Amino acid sequence: MITTTPFGTAPSGSPVTVYNLVCAGARARVMDYGATILGIEVPDASNDVVDIVLGFDALDGYFDNPACYGGTIGPSANRTDKGQIKIDGTVYQMACNDGPDKANNLHTDLEYGLHKRVWNATVDEITNTVSFTCKLADGEL
């Protein structure tokens, strides 16, 4: 079963929604801001239900979230040496935003990356799933 809950407003002014998924004694909470995992609750060895995801209780915690807790990172995740990637022989330069001398790129764009955007959500009640999509213009990030 999937239910939705309003969660606030993104800095862009778009409403943010939490999707609550329940199946076989487990519960997952995800939101469309950053296609972010908010929580996964499962029974522990004592059969107590515990949340195994680090994150914040309020939406605004995700606005300034340098650890990117739960968010979808991309198009490039982790560190990229000198902020450069090579695709089909063409070198693309990304902003250098990481390291003591800011010589590398971390997670494409920490300020405007995929984890900072409101994604489109599609709920499928038959398969009990939520799918998130985010379209970018060619070369946007």
What is each model feature region?
Residues M1-L141:
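Surface-exposed acidic/polar loop and edge beta-strand patches at domain peripheries
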